[in-house]
Curated annotation (Swiss-Prot):
Gene coding for it: ANK3
Protein's UniProt name: Putative ankyrin repeat protein FPV031
Cross-referenced InterPro entries: Ankyrin_rpt, Ankyrin_rpt-contain_sf, PRANC_domain
Gene3D superfamilies: Ankyrin repeat-containing domain
Domain of life: Viruses
Amino acid sequence: MPFLIELLRITGIVTLCPKYRLDRNSLLLVATKRNYIDVVRYLVKKGVDINFQETIRDNLTPLMIASRFNSHQLVELLLNNGAIINQRSLTCGNTALHLAVKNDNRITVDILLFHGANTNITNNDGFTPLHKAVIYNASIDIIKKLLRYKADVNIRDNEEENTGLTPLDIAMSCNNYEIISLLVSHVIRLDYSTCMSNKTKGFDHNKKLVKDNKRLQRIAIHCLKDIEKMKQVSINSRFTLFDLFVNNNVDLLLRCINKDNRFIVNFDKKLTVFNILYTDFIDTFMSRHVLLNKASKVLEDLFLDNDSNTSSWNNLPNEIKDHIFTYINNDELKIMTGSKT
């Protein structure tokens, strides 16, 4: 009965409100705004256009609306039924991820990233989701998650007077020290990495910002001290802890580290500025360790009946298995093992 009541309510809204047309697309938009999950599910089954953009205000799709209001169950429902995750609104060019970040909706951000949302797509102002996160003072967890999913701190917006502002430029104007510190440490990490992002003009701009600003210089000095601490920790005869951290090489760390990993896991307590990024590195490491064990068990069970076959997964050397897993990211492992996002 609640389903019928909800359907009648939104039908009444669409009928009485002159800004809506009486059709299934309008019903879907209103049902999404009201978080009427059963009604949305019903309309989706009836073949409504799931990527329809409203003709009022910001021209948002149902996915954008659900992301804006943190209706994460609806976000999952829409994505699983064909919603275009990187679709841009006609008015502002925002994507669902822009809107989720702007409203500090952590669960929705996680879901969108898991489903492949582009962290570097720009809106009409040239803002990436990372720009939005800094502008609207999003939680540090969201900013860390964006960086983990390859958000580029060196992309510049459409500001004409300064040939474009990076997220670090904006963070300095917003004066949030925690965000500034995180972005500076990320820029310095990139400088030591093999990432192509450190070959761009935006990266050169960010480096100059750090060099020319005394406050940022102090942060950079602490970063360099943290780097020296990590370089003192040998992982094997070839690599230090910093070598693995700077390129986020959790697979190599998994292969090299012994069973007692408490020293590596708790090393963040020895760091001053890099502690946030290092904690994220270790979180990825720990999560991957669990997922790889689950994935190995899934494959072992799958090939259990074929053990007599020398080409079976179970007969492969561990080195080969490890190499194969390097091509599978954590989100793909979650799908493979049926783990939650």
